[in-house]
Amino acid sequence: PLVNKAVAWLEDNWSEEHQCWPIISEKANDNPRAPWWNWDEKTVSKGVFNPAADLCAALRDFGIDSELIDKSTSRQIDELRSGAEIEDHDLICLVRQVEGNAIEDQALVDLIRQAIRSKVSKTPDDLTNYGLRPRFVISGPTSVLYSDNRAEVDMELAFLAETQCDDGSWAPNWSWFGQFDEAWPKAEK
């Protein structure tokens, strides 16, 4: 029932004009949030890769058959072929499409691999800032991306072991940059 409701929501919220799902709802502006979750008219068309690529892969994993999966995947492939900028969060979502073999064009897979290689955090100093951490794009040693990024995975695992708090958590390496100061301390925990 939960998956069926999610699929119904996706079908109801598909933007035929932009060939994607919204990355965020307009209602998000009613609540405390990080600045990157501010909704405006431009955010409607930003969901081509994020969250769409991840959604398509998840729907395939659940055996859902929907023409929107094919439409969305086709749009993603078109965007990749056009040379569209691939941001860090886009890469996180595209990895599931690559690992699920939804992107069959090896040149596009190589493009995604190269983008990950160029953007993934490579030093412990990189990990103290907001960025593309190896574990965000590499699920484990069987990942098709693991061999390209093994040193970075090992470096991040060592960093995580060194920076874990006494209670077993890790402090965020980002903030809301002064937006909703009254709500940030609760969100930070």
Per-segment meaning from a language model:
Residues 1-189:
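Preference for long, amphipathic alpha-helical scaffolds in soluble/luminal domains
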